[in-house]
Every structure is written in structure tokens, then in C-alpha cells.
Swiss-Prot record:
Transmembrane segments: none annotated. This is Altered inheritance of mitochondria protein 32. Belongs to the AIM32 family. It comes from Kluyveromyces lactis (strain ATCC 8585 / CBS 2359 / DSM 70799 / NBRC 1267 / NRRL Y-1140 / WM37). CDD domains: TRX_Fd_Sucrase. It holds the Pfam family Suc_Fer-like.
Length: 322
């Protein structure tokens, strides 16, 4: 796969143009695992999975033969509410957005509030257990990517924080009715003019600290999927041994997977100015089918700017905005 994707756009009637959209900040290449190495990895992984499945209920058996879904949600911002207790991830409610207990309940509050903002539809929200970064009884901390900042938000101001994330309140516009069109183009134009503006709303600001680091987050939402819950701490331990300087955390269910060993690897490539805001140059790789037996192999290739397609689900990168 190339570093660029091609998009066809219409510039003028009857004229097509091809534009290049960069996929990544880093010069990645896509490769497949050679058959001989793949066979060895499969053998090692099958032995591990057999032992792991003995701990799991019948309905949650791990199956490494499942086809990998090469699809990720379309999003431009990932908001991660940092847990009060980095060791308490095994007790996260199955559906955080429906939780009643603080701080988990704030995930639902934030998601709901984002729906009323201008740019909230492309925001992912999760809870993250990350050593060294914790929320308190009164204040929440949020790691926001690609801002690459940790924001502190009072628990009573989560709705205001949604306005900040979503670029203000959604425009309030009058919808044109059929009767408006019956009155003619002048009437339609005047209706649009008088109703197109929204009441000016000030977007609040919040204190933050920089987070200029790579981070790997592993799905470990135990009460949502026991497979993830059993496997996540093993993957974190392996990551910490092979990449001791990499920040690692356990994240709540991030959607669209039936196979444990799901990981998002956000790589920080410096800062840039985008829409008058300073944001990180971020490559976010979504990986799956990771086990302690193959994790080092996958990351050794990533360190050489090689993505192994056998484990690749998709990506999010701010390179597409440049």
C-alpha cells in the first residue's frame, strides 16, 4: 500500500481532478508476514489461546481464526476520561454510557452533550486507566488526541467541556418548508438570511498540561468482554518489557471487534498549527489479533516503519489534514 491515497473530486462541471491525500506522517510500508514465520507464530499462539480459553466461559472463547475487520470508525478526535483508580478497570460497568456511578457516568454525560455541538459527531469517547494520570472526586482529567493535552474539568462542567471539544453549540437554523418555496426565490433567500445565523456562543477554555508522548492503549473492558479483560494485562506487561519508555494503558471497549488483543497505538510526531490551534502530528494505528507471542514481532516492525497487514485494522492520522 502506498503512503498516499487518491481521491477524485469535481472542481468544475465536467472536469475531474485527482488529489493526493497523505495517509501517515511516518514513511510506513505495508507488508505481510512470510508464511514460514506466520506458521510458527500461529503454533505458539494456539498453545497460548488453548490455556487462556480454559479460564474463559464457553460464550467468550478466543478464536484466532476469525477474519480481521479492516475497518475503524471515522473520527478526528479521541477523548479519554482518565480513571480515578488505574487498577480498577476490571470493575468498569459493561456500558459506560449508561453507568450511574461517578466517574463512569460522566462518559454518558459527555457523549450526550457532544450531540448538541457543531463538531461532536467525529469524537470518540472512552475511559482510560493510565498510571500517573488520575481523576479525582471533584475534577476529571481527559487526555485528548490529537490535541496531545490532558485537560482538567470540574465534574459539574462536563457539558461545557463538550462545547469546547465540539467547537461550540450546534447552529440553530430554521428549516425551509414547502410553503417557503411556494413564495418564490426571494422569500426563500430572505428566510435563509434571517435564520442562518446562530446565537453567538462563547466557547469555554480549560486548563491543560502537555502530553507529548507515544501511547499504546489496549482494550481491557472486562465486564464488556472477558477475553479482553484477561488478555489486556498480559499485553501491557509484554509492552512494558519490550518498550519500557512507551506509555501504556487499558482502555474501555472502542468498538467493532470480536477478537481480543485490540490495541490503538498513537505516535506523536511533533506539533503543527491546524485551524489556528496547536495540535499533534499523530499517526494512530488500530491493531488486532495481538498476543504476548506476536506482540514483539509486530512492534519490532513498527519501529522500522513497517505495518504488518495481518494485524492491521485501520488508522487515524492528522496527516490527512495537511
Amino acid at each position: 500500500m502506498n503512503l498516499y491515497s487518491y481521491s477524485r473530486i469535481i472542481k468544475f462541471p465536467g472536469h475531474n481532478a485527482l488529489v493526493l491525500k497523505r495517509l501517515f506522517h511516518r514513511p510506513y510500508q505495508f507488508k505481510s508476514v512470510p508464511d514460514d514465520i506466520k506458521n510458527n507464530l500461529v503454533t505458539e499462539c494456539e498453545c497460548f489461546v488453548k490455556r487462556l480459553n480454559e479460564k474463559l466461559p464457553d460464550k467468550s472463547q478466543l478464536d484466532i481464526s476469525l477474519t480481521l475487520p479492516n475497518k475503524v470508525p471515522e473520527y478526528h478526535k479521541h477523548v479519554l476520561m482518565l480513571s480515578k483508580d488505574p487498577k480498577g478497570w476490571k470493575n468498569w460497568p459493561s456500558k459506560l454510557e449508561m453507568a450511574h456511578e461517578y466517574p463512569h457516568s460522566m462518559v454518558g454525560t459527555l457523549k450526550s452533550s457532544l450531540k448538541d455541538t457543531r463538531d461532536g459527531s467525529g469524537v470518540l469517547v472512552n475511559e482510560l486507566a493510565l498510571d500517573g494520570y488520575t481523576s479525582s472526586e471533584t475534577h476529571l482529567k481527559f487526555l485528548v488526541i490529537p490535541d496531545m493535552k490532558v485537560y482538567e474539568v470540574h465534574r459539574d462542567r462536563v457539558s461545557d467541556f463538550a462545547l469546547f471539544l465540539g467547537d461550540g453549540k450546534q447552529d440553530s437554523r430554521k428549516k425551509l418548508s414547502f410553503n417557503d418555496f411556494l413564495k418564490g426565490s426571494d422569500a426563500v433567500g430572505q428566510t435563509a438570511i434571517h435564520s442562518s445565523g446562530s446565537v453567538a456562543n462563547s466557547i469555554p477554555n480549560f486548563q491543560s498540561e502537555p502530553f507529548h508522548s507515544d501511547i499504546a492503549m489496549v482494550c481491557g473492558h472486562y465486564l464488556r468482554d472477558a477475553r479482553c479483560g484477561e488478555l489486556a494485562p498480559l499485553l501491557i506487561a509484554k509492552l512494558n518489557s519490550i518498550k519500557p519508555n512507551l506509555k501504556t494503558g487499558i482502555v474501555s471497549h472502542f468498538g467493532g471487534h470480536k477478537f481480543a488483543g485490540n490495541l490503538i497505538y498513537y505516535q506523536f510526531n511533533g506539533l503543527k498549527i491546524h485551524n489556528d490551534n496547536e495540535t499533534g502530528k499523530i499517526d494512530g494505528l488500530w491493531l488486532s489479533k495481538l498476543l504476548p507471542q506476536n506482540l514483539e514481532f509486530v512492534f519490532r516492525h513498527l519501529d522500522k516503519d513497517i505495518i504488518l497487514q495481518d494485524f492491521y485494522r485501520g488508522h487515524m492520522s492528522t496527516a490527512a489534514y495537511t
